[in-house]
Amino acid sequence: MFNALDVDRWVAERRSSLDEAKVSVAGIIQAVREGGDGALLAMARKHEPEVTSVRVTEDEVEAAYGEVDDRLLESLIEAEARITRFHELQKERSLWLEEVEPGIVLGVKTTPLDRVGLYVPGRRAAYPSTALMNAVPAKVAGVPEMCACTPPPILPLTLVALDIAGVDEVYRIGGAQAVAAMALGTESIRPVQKI
């Protein structure tokens, strides 16, 4: 049974871990801010030593299709269509106004951003569905530019899902450095308005 001392100890342990994470992430953000693409490339090479660029090429995306089973490809296409339909229904309700009192009108209007960034987990937590669930709503909302970051090595299925979902740029970057790159921008990654 948990008592007050156990709770205090548990909170103190978590606070210590959080403080360590803050220091680590601050260092990563600073490295991306100062080192740009070079810092990103160095971090990516820890997981994929032969990487020469953080940007995934169109040839790599095309090659990924050849590595994905036809049934899986059909499943991704079907999932994209279903997710699209769901979010189209939401979009139909993206503007509403209601007069709550005479002369007082409340409402909501949804307006797409110009450029968004998506973080798609990888390695042991690689779920290509995350690519669809993040990119399709943005596409349906009318966001004209999407970039995605996913840690190396990237599963072919993830690349195919990102392509099916309409993502314009894919970068082999994971973790805090991916979020920093999308937020701050680098020599080759233009900053986004929302991640």
Residue ranges and their predicted role:
Residues V23, T111-D114, A141, A165, ...:
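Structured loop/turn residues at beta-strand edges in well-structured enzyme cores
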Residues A26, L41, E80, T84, ...:
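Predominant activation on well-ordered alpha-helical scaffold segments within soluble catalytic domains
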Residues M1-D8, L159-V170:
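Active-site-proximal helix-loop elements at catalytic-domain edges
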Residues G166-I195:
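Conserved NAD(P)+-binding/catalytic subdomain of aldehyde/semialdehyde dehydrogenases
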Residues G36, P144, D168:
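Short acidic/polar active-site loop segments enriched in Thr and Asp
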Residues M1-D114:
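N-terminal Rossmann-like NAD(P)+-binding subdomain of aldehyde/semialdehyde dehydrogenases
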Residues R82, F86-R93, Y119-G122, A141, ...:
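Mid-sequence acidic-hydrophobic segments that form the walls
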Residues L97-A161:
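Conserved small-residue-rich beta-alpha loop and adjacent elements
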